[in-house]
Amino acid sequence: MHPAQGSLCKEGNEWKFGYKAHFGVDSKSGLVHSLEVTSANVHDVTMTSELLTGEEEVVYGDSGYIGAEKRDDAITRNKHGKKIKYKINRKPSQIKLLSKSGQYKAKKNEHQKSSVRAKVEHVFSVIKNLFSFRKTRYRGKRKQFAKLNFLFPLANLYLADRRFGLSV
């Protein structure tokens, strides 16, 4: 497995090298503050501590981040010594095990978490649709990182202009 530590993935009958972009987004502004590129076989939860800036009070994530706060490398306090709350979406199968009233409360809670997480998904949408980054042309993590390091600030500019009405 050479091309700079990309994992080998099969799509249909074609074998390709896969990479994954992990990034942190500010929950208030919706702008990207950190970026890591790994091979595709690295799980999301292993990159949690690298994506935190130290200013966070609450960390939101999808069900791929379940158990992030229990890991050995987990950051439990921010730079100011305040405990970080991890608000991770549950899997739907976990919600089905609850009573009817418990399901109602859990779904409401999950909806609130998902509404914050939508800012992360919006950044993905901008990168994929506005900048047409669906398939990479480069092999190697360093080249992927360089390309994404160029695209994410552009996405930040686009999103900042739309959210805050900044004129350039």
Give the ranges of each region predicted by the language model.
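C-terminal domain-tail junction helix/linker
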Residues: 146-152, 162-168
